[in-house]
Amino acid sequence: DGYEYTMECECMEKRRGKWRLQKSGLQDMAERYRFETYEAKTSWQKSILTAAECFCEEREGWFYIGGQAGAGKTHICTAIANRLLLQGKGVRYMIWTEEATKLKALKTDDENYAREIDKWKTAEVLYIDDFLKTRNGALPTDGDINLAFEIINARYNNRALRTIFSGERGLNEIMELDEAMGSRIYQRCGKYKLKIGW
């Protein structure tokens, strides 16, 4: 009939998956931190694993896990991000301390600031690791709180965007720092608000 047709081969979805993984920033951790490698020996670890796997089956919502360092928060959140990547979602990985410093440094450069923060505001899935972490356990600055609120509020206003948080602070402490921000996280997380060791 004079027309040419093309059809994707099966390998294209695998290629897209690899590209999404590279773009997410999780490539180095993706192989080590999966559900299959999470050691769930105790009842609380089993509960966390179950909640994380259930979260991946949901179509919307947020996930928050807080608690002491070394408890497996990054592992379980990376496993969630991995699973969502495999489901075809676009994931971005943010190490709070690094990206917050970069964004605050751009605050006086409106154009660059808007371009950079938009990446975090609009990512289909955003994983924020070490949320509001500071040096030596100090309280976050007003600049940190304002930056976090700007990102969270933009994401809160778009139900299609999913957010995964890990941090050493519990949600109750986040609420004390900024009630508007904490209440948005609390509401969007629903049943996926987990804490370790409090």
Q: Model-found features: residue ranges?
A:
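Walker B catalytic acidic pair
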Residues: 129-131
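Residue-level preference for the first positions of well-ordered beta-strands
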Residues: 60-64, 90-91, 125, 162-164
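P-loop NTPase Walker A phosphate-binding motif
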Residues: 74-89
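Walker A/P-loop nucleotide-binding motif
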Residues: 60-78
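Short glycine-rich substrate-engagement loop in P-loop NTPases that contacts/grips substrate
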Residues: 46-49, 85-122, 139-142
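A short, basic N-terminal segment
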Residues: 1-47, 196
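Pre-Walker A (pre-P-loop) alpha-helix and adjacent loop at the N terminus of AAA/AAA+ ATPase modules
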Residues: 37-63
